[in-house]
Amino acid sequence: MFELNNFDALQIGLASTEKIREWSRGEVKKPETINYRTLKPERDGLFCERIFGPQKDWECHCGKYKRIRYKGIVCDRCGVEVTKAKVRRERMGHIELAAPVSHIWYFKGIPSRMGLILDMSPRALEKVLYFASYVVLDPKETQLLKKQLLTEKEYREAVDKYGEQNFVASMGAESVKKLLEEIDLEQLSLVLKEDLKNSTGQKKIRIIRRLEVVESFRKSGNRPEWMVIDVIPVIPPDLRPMVQLDGGRFATSDLNDLYRRVINRNNRLKKLLDLGAPDIIVRNEKRMLQEAVDALIDNGRRGRPVTGPGNRPLKSLSDMLKGKQGRFRQNLLGKRVDYSGRSVIVVGPELKMYQCGLPKEMALELFKPFVMKKLVERGLAHNIKSAKRMVERVQAQVWDVLEEVISDHPVLLNRAPTLHRLGIQAFQPVLVEGRAIKLHPLSCTAYNADFDGDQMAVHVPLSVEAQSEARFLMLAAHNILKPSDGKPVVVPTQDMVLGSYYLTVEREGAKGEGRYFSFPDEVIMAYQLKQIDINAKIKVKMTKIIDGKYISGIIDATAGKIIFNECVPQDLGFIDRSKPGNEFKLEIDFLVAKKNLGKIINKCYMKHGATKTSIMLDKIKARGYHYSTISGITVSTSDMEVPEAKKRLLSESDAAVDKIEKMYRRGFISEDERYQRVIERWTKTTEDVADELMNNLDKFNPIFMMADSGARGSKSQIKQLAGMRGLMANPSGKIIELPIRASFREGLDVLEYFISTHGARKGNADTALKTADSGYLTRRLVDVSQDVIVREEDCGTYEGYDVSEIKEGNEVIESLSERLTGRYSAEDIIDPNNHQIIVPKNSYMDSKLADRIEASGIKKVKIRSVFTCKSRHGVCSKCYGMNMATAQKIDIGESVGIIAAQSIGEPGTQLTMRTFHTGGVAGSDITQGLPRVEELFEARKPKGLAIVSEVSGTVKMEETKKKRSVSVITDNGEEVTYDIPFGSRIKVSNGDLISAGDEVTEGSVNPHDILRIKGVQGVKNYLLSEVQKVYRLQGVDINDKHLEVVIRQMTRKIKIEESGDTELLPGTMIDIFDFEEENARVEASGGSAAQGRVALLGITKAALATESFLSAASFQETTRVLTDAAIKGKIDPLLGLKENVIIGKLIPAGTGMTRYRSIKINTENEVQENQLEA
């Protein structure tokens, strides 16, 4: 049986006149919509019931047939079929045009498809189509040329010269249609291919462009004359509705106005033709008809747009698809869903990690159908209707039933903006009073939520499958690691950190110091009886059973550490238990700040898994809150003391700056140097004052404790509170050399305050701009990588990718072990010291193995990488390696593309926006932060270009008065010289050995140059390490594999250079796999293969060049993508996520993959158990 939703691919093409008539249920002849008195549709008008179906279910226009029993009858009086009103959403009509018109997409798009196939310029075409010039269709015996343009005057002269019968020339779309009909695609294709062999330069480019269009038509079976329309389809009336507003007026869709103009002009043209009106009038009417149809299809593409009331351009068919409010993005990719609600969130510290508090009334509304069913099952209501009444009146029994319904029904909580997959998690609901949703404090980091009025949305998974997915895959207690770097995302913050810090800090000379206790419980009892201080150093006898024997030993501890260790499993590996004497030590015997908490959680997760970790986290949360309250840590002005040495330091600096000024005035140093020295001096002073301040602070100073524990604030903020604020930047980013001497404790004077406002305002403006930019970057990343899914276990490639540590100067940005963890080796890794194999080929490397490899002194390792994966669609499990979010090997079906895009996009808002100025030297500004990431992913030519050596060799420097130059002398004596522009800093020195692709001057390199010099692997390496540098400098960790996924998508296309015996055209882009396939096919039959080179596309370009036209059209440039796809008759194989969301199928990832589809969830046993219990 043919099912409407059961298809594997989708094809788009041009519609022929016959096809449009086939779709249609009748011709729309009148421009009328509905009768103003009866409010019923006019017959043969734009809302006609005879064409489009009845307005009311099972009721004809005249009212002769009402009720379902007349289903399918066509009324003999009014001609309306008795059927459901829903057909008005699917039945189409048509308008028979009195004269053909061209379709604006194919004539006006860039490049003009109509112009290319006819070999006419778009300008000339426009003149013909809009009745400004004649075009010669058949010159016969005359000296005119075919397709030659004639103005009115030239036409008359030609008629006088040759006579009207001796040649054929006409204007308008009819003449263009005739020319298109005459085209023999097969013949034209052969002619163009011949011409291509003998042409060069611009001519060659033009022929390739023409050939592309001709081949598209030839292969797709579309005919060129279908670009000219004889019949216009009218879309169903319910898709362009007309509704009555209160006050008797009507609101209508713009499309109705546009259709009405077409019908009016068409009818007038018919009438004029019947009357045999003069040519000039008919011509004008035809031109107006052409313009009306243009406006309907794409208003504003040519000339001024047609406007409605208030000078607003009308929304045409193209506008309905485009942009954020268009059909694709508004209705197909993002729908509003039922069974959802939203409310303000408040903190719920009493909740377990997997719970959330749901307000009673909200829960009742969300779970209404479930509650009603249960009420009927229980016999509390006789039927669904009375159950509904009970729920609406909120009777007492309803609450008990609701409790039972939600007891094992997880809900999804989402906070906008959802920047990564942790922005939607599942929780077990707990009913709460009030109207606010309660959120577990540890889930805040993942959601980036706080309780200053944030709102969250709740969604109810309905089907059993959806519920089990929510419970097993999305439960908050399972989402402990961050998918971007595999570090814990649920790290306690603020009060919890402060509490843990307070528990594990030791105080010298506290009450009870040095006392001995015989077991831990005795310590806690002593603390509760106020015998000892919680931070006092004490000795405790610990007893353990080892090999069936009781063994005891005495350890150093504090009451706080004992309390804290009760929360934590004692086998995490912080203490080496194999050493004698270590058996009794507390696992956490150090000061617990925020950093260490992350380590504790990581170790617990690796050792014990998610469930135990979430239990430990809940315990730490409870203790943290309790003891941070008891500690009584508060903030007061007196906690901040201005260091005594500040005065002395300031006056010393003043003297030093005076000295620098004197030197400048005497001409010993330049202005730049003076500025640099003053800045350096004040920076040092600020740091000295800060050091003095930090050294004077007591270890138990509350503000110090907050900063030191990582609960809130930082050293630099303390420095500003009581040290000095230091140097500030002016609005352009240049540092002002007058420092702010005061601290906030002392108070700023007017000038200082004014200088500070620059930075504060710039910060706010930056944040607002950054959010939008970062969001747009994420959207492009998602679009380019959304169809990358793990589709197989092993692609069987022999290639690998060499990794070594990434350095910026002397600083290691990413160590080798970090880059190896969770990857597969591409070859045997051999220890250089004893020549034994550490890791065999194709084996998985965990963090222990990675550390061992690094320790053995190996500098470079070949690993399996997404870069070299040979999977045609998506990647294979071995090339990808570990799933960062679970620390396990990745499962087949995981949508790693989306995860990669989110991991790169989510921290985008933390990157800076600024361009650093290097003391006013023009041309040497380096782009950093977000703009730099964007520049790399879009493969743009960067600002501040560095000069790159094209060859390998030895450096020779020359400097004359007029210019500086650097030469590179190759091994065979060739010399390549580069002139260095003024103001650039040279990176190499005389006699250096450099290799091709190395930078000669400082700055950023154009990635296309690297592709040319170092090849594909070189450019992939460059992009990866450059993006990593930007993120790491901001303190953001992203695993390499996410960047690899995106960069692989940027280098998937090949630009054909020589076509050989293949069907491929030079200059066109084709997927690497298609390229290899086509070459293999040709070589098998003895032909010569095509030549091409890998092209580097920016993410926007790469997203638009995807196989799927649905995905590309829903991304950007909708009309261009669809025009191109229609001419090529493209088939969308529906492999990515986006396409499947658009057509409403399950996405082919995760449990939606075909290999998992047949899994059934068995609920029978549960049902039986429940019945037995009842």
From Swiss-Prot:
- Which residues are recorded as binding Zn(2+) 1? C60, C62, C75, C78
InterPro entries on file:
DNA-dir_RpoC_beta_prime, DNA-dir_RpoC_beta_prime_bact, RNA_pol_asu, RNA_pol_N, RNA_pol_Rpb1_1, RNA_pol_Rpb1_3, RNA_pol_Rpb1_3_sf, RNA_pol_Rpb1_4
Where is Mg(2+) bound in this sequence? D450, D452, D454
Q: Which Pfam families match?
A: RNA_pol_Rpb1_1 (PF04997), RNA_pol_Rpb1_2 (PF00623), RNA_pol_Rpb1_3 (PF04983), RNA_pol_Rpb1_4 (PF05000), RNA_pol_Rpb1_5 (PF04998)
- Asked if the keyword Transcription belongs to this entry, the reply reads yes
The regions listed as transmembrane in this protein's record are none
Q: Name one GO cellular component term.
A: DNA-directed RNA polymerase complex
GO:BP terms for this protein?
Answer: DNA-templated transcription
**Gene3D superfamilies the UniProt entry points to:** 1.10.132.30, 1.10.150.390, 1.10.1790.20, 1.10.40.90, 2.40.40.20, 2.40.50.100, RNA polymerase II, clamp domain (4.10.860.120), RNA polymerase Rpb1, domain 3 (1.10.274.100)
What is catalysed by this protein? RNA(n) + a ribonucleoside 5'-triphosphate = RNA(n+1) + diphosphate
MF term (GO), any: DNA-directed RNA polymerase activity
Disulfides per UniProt: none
Its required cofactor(s), as named, are: Mg(2+); Zn(2+)
**Sorted UniProt keywords:** DNA-directed RNA polymerase, Magnesium, Metal-binding, Nucleotidyltransferase, Transcription, Transferase, Zinc
What is the E.C. number? 2.7.7.6
Q: Cofactor note, please?
A: Binds 1 Mg(2+) ion per subunit.
Binding-site residues for Zn(2+) 2, renumbered to this chain: C795, C869, C876, C879
User: Which HAMAP family does this UniProt record tie to the protein?
Assistant: RNApol_bact_RpoC
| Quaternary structure, from the entry | The RNAP catalytic core consists of 2 alpha, 1 beta, 1 beta' and 1 omega subunit. When a sigma factor is associated with the core the holoenzyme is formed, which can initiate transcription.
Cross-referenced PANTHER family = DNA-DIRECTED RNA POLYMERASE (PTHR19376), DNA-DIRECTED RNA POLYMERASE SUBUNIT BETA (PTHR19376:SF54)
Q: State what this protein does.
A: DNA-dependent RNA polymerase catalyzes the transcription of DNA into RNA using the four ribonucleoside triphosphates as substrates.
Family classification: Belongs to the RNA polymerase beta' chain family.
Name the chain's protein: DNA-directed RNA polymerase subunit beta'
The coding gene here is: rpoC
